[in-house]
């Protein structure tokens, strides 16, 4: 079975140190330590144990550590501590007392919201001395209002921060701490130019002296090395390699399948509970996410859809509820906007070379045809002129660009996710590393399973086909090389315990469900979901502010029901169960063990006497006879 137990592990923790003992107990304010204890921070992780003391000493730090290793606390705790120390030496009446002293730059809105939430939890016992504001989302007018009080910590994306600095809505004259989280992603999203303009000494936005820098990244790419000189001065470089026990917590598998059989496999995995615990299913576009959700709903599998079309508050609320155990399955759209330009260029170059060789003869034929067409189409003499040939019309399909600051695959802290399923293989190896980084976090074990479509199987079924699957084999080779290089491990092929043929018994049920999920119904579900989430996000915002407990009753996994409902698909017959998986102890996987035939008629206890009469031959009753 594909089940993986989420057993806690100390592989990522440094047991030699404790937040309640020196040096941390003497370096960090007691109010911050109590807040950390409330969040179950007993021992620091490796990156926290190394980075926090260095940052508190005033040194710049460049740290490379995998996702889920606790990088957020490694820079937030020193930032809060330095603000508390600075305010302790100033009078509350002084003009310098309330000022923005720390800037946190992140690549996505979701990560900004998460960092803001963590910062508020860390400072909850500081009596309002440390104010934190997230300006990554929201309009300019709202951001100006938030910045009027000169918050101590501002969390933003580089583009938003640059806009605020240009409009003079934010002053950084008292800035003393600058942290960049997920630096490799921030650069891959195209924020390098914005970051360069922010750090330009001629602009005068960032003080030339007295600003401590911190760069956190999952990888140390050439781009990260390139901006090191912009942000850091003589930094301490931490390249933290995890012990073998930590890297082995993630079990990575793949299986070759057709585009249609993806739906069969995901149905078998989830409905028969071959993967236990909470799962994140990644797809490559928004339409694909709704198609998977509607398909799974046919079998009674509840799941949430998360994509950049939904309001930020809804997306973040889904993550919080997933972490609390409210939802077990999330279908997340990872459109990979702007990621890994170099790798994509290499793929395009390879494709262009192969296509160029094949199209040489076609180009020559096309040139000859053009010459013949020009000779035949010479304009006739006279005042009337032929209408000029119009340029080729643009395709009618509306090309929707993904929001580069919205992604659940990158930097978001999913806790206790036991598995990640790449329903659609990502476009690049970097995207793969960040997707599988959503599981096996904080010392817990995890499983990653990827569906790979062979080139010869791509495009055979247009109804369920996706363009990105055409490159699955090339991308997967890059993924295997990178996994081998960075973690010295291999992605193993999943053999389904030699019983993949027995899955065919479920195919007819998959076909029935997939036929009901048409393109029209997917579009209807897409509109309904956005409308519903906008209503929840905007109309009820004031209500939830006054009644925070009511927010826990807001559900995101409600069935969309635009597809034809087939209730029999929700129950798996018992004759199918033993062939693929053992029945779990304590009951059947199915909601109902079986439905037997009843001898009773539709009207209840009814016999030959007609409606309401007793069964068998009885004495006839004369309705006119007086009793």
UniProtKB/Swiss-Prot annotation:
Pfam families: DEAD, Helicase_C. ATP binds at residues 65-72. Residues 249-487 form the Helicase C-terminal domain. Residues 340-365 have a biased composition (Acidic residues). Residues 599-618 have a biased composition (Basic residues). One of its GO terms (cellular component) is nucleolus. CDD domains: DEADc_DDX56, SF2_C_DEAD. Its EC number is 3.6.4.13. GO terms for molecular function: ATP binding; ATP hydrolysis activity; RNA binding; RNA helicase activity. A motif (DEAD box) lies at residues 181-184. One of its GO terms (biological process) is rRNA processing. Residues 52-238 form the Helicase ATP-binding domain. It catalyses: ATP + H2O = ADP + phosphate + H(+). Gene3D superfamilies: P-loop containing nucleotide triphosphate hydrolases. Residues 337-410, 586-627 are annotated as: Disordered. Residues 366-378 have a biased composition (Basic and acidic residues). Signal peptide: none annotated. It is found in: Nucleus, Nucleolus. ATP-binding RNA helicase involved in the biogenesis of 60S ribosomal subunits and is required for the normal formation of 25S and 5.8S rRNAs. This is ATP-dependent RNA helicase DBP9. The lineage of its organism: Eukaryota, Fungi, Dikarya, Basidiomycota, Agaricomycotina.
């Amino acid at each position: 079975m594909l089940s993986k137990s989420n057993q806690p592990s100390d592989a990522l923790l440094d047991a030699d140190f404790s937040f309640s003992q020196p040096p941390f107990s003497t370096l960090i304010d007691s109010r911050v330590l109590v807040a950390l204890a409330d969040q179950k921070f007993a021992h620091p992780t490796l990156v926290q144990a190394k980075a926090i003391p260095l940052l508190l000493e005033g040194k710049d730090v460049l740290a490379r550590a995998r996702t889920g290793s606790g990088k957020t606390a490694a820079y937030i705790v020193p930032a809060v501590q330095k603000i508390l120390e600075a305010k302790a030496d100033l009078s509350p009446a002084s003009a310098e007392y309330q000022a923005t002293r720390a800037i946190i730059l992140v690549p996505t809105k979701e990560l900004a919201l998460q960092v803001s939430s963590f910062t508020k939890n860390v400072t909850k016992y500081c009596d309002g001395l440390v104010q934190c504001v997230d300006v990554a989302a929201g309009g300019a007018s709202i951001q100006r209002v938030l910045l009027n009080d000169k918050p101590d910590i501002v969390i933003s994306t580089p583009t938003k921060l640059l806009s605020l600095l240009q409009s003079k809505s934010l002053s950084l004259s008292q800035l003393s701490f600058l942290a960049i989280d997920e630096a490799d992603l921030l650069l891959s999203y195209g924020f390098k130019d914005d970051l360069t303009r922010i750090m330009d000494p001629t602009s005068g936005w960032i003080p030339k002296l007295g600003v401590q820098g911190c760069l956190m990244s999952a990888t140390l790419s050439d781009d990260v090395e390139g901006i090191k000189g912009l942000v850091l001065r003589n930094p301490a470089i931490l390249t933290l390699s995890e012990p073998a026990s930590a890297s082995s917590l993630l079990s990575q598998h793949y299986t070759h399948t057709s585009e249609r059989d993806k739906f069969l496999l995901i149905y078998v995995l989830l409905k028969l509970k071959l993967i236990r615990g909470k799962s994140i299913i990644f797809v490559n576009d928004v339409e694909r996410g709704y198609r998977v959700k509607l398909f799974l709903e046919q079998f009674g599998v509840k799941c949430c859809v998360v994509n950049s079309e939904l309001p930020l508050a809804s997306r973040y609320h889904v993550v919080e509820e997933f972490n609390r155990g409210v939802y077990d399955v999330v279908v997340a759209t990872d459109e990979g906007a702007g990621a890994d330009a170099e790798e994509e260029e290499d793929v395009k170059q390879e494709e262009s070379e192969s296509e160029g060789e094949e199209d040489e003869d076609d180009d020559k034929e096309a040139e000859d045809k053009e010459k013949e067409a020009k000779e035949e189409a010479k304009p006739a003499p006279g005042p009337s002129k032929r209408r000029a040939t119009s340029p080729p019309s643009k395709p009618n399909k509306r090309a929707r660009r993904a929001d580069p600051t919205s992604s659940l695959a990158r930097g978001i802290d999913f806790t206790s996710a036991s598995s990640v399923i790449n329903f659609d293989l990502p476009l690049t190896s970097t995207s793969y590393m960040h997707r599988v980084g959503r599981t096996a976090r904080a010392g817990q074990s995890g499983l990653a399973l990827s569906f790979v479509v062979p080139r010869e199987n791509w495009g055979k079924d247009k109804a369920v086909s996706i363009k990105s699957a055409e490159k699955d084999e090339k991308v997967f080779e890059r993924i295997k090389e990178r996994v081998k290089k960075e973690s010295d491990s291999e992605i193993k092929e999943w053999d389904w315990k030699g019983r993949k043929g027995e899955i065919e018994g479920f195919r007819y049920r998959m076909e029935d469900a997939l036929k009901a999920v048409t393109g029209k119904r997917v579009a209807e579900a897409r509109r309904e979901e956005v409308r519903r989430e906008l209503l929840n996000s905007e109309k009820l915002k004031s209500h939830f502010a006054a009644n925070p407990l009511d927010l826990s009753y807001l559900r995101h996994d409600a069935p969309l029901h635009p597809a034809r409902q087939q209730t029999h698909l929700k129950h798996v017959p018992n004759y199918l169960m033993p062939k693929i998986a053992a029945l779990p102890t304590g009951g059947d996987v199915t909601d109902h063990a079986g439905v037997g035939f009843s001898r009773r008629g539709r009207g209840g206890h009814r016999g030959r006497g007609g409606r309401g009469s007793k069964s068998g031959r009885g004495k006839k009753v004369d309705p006119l006879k007086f009793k």
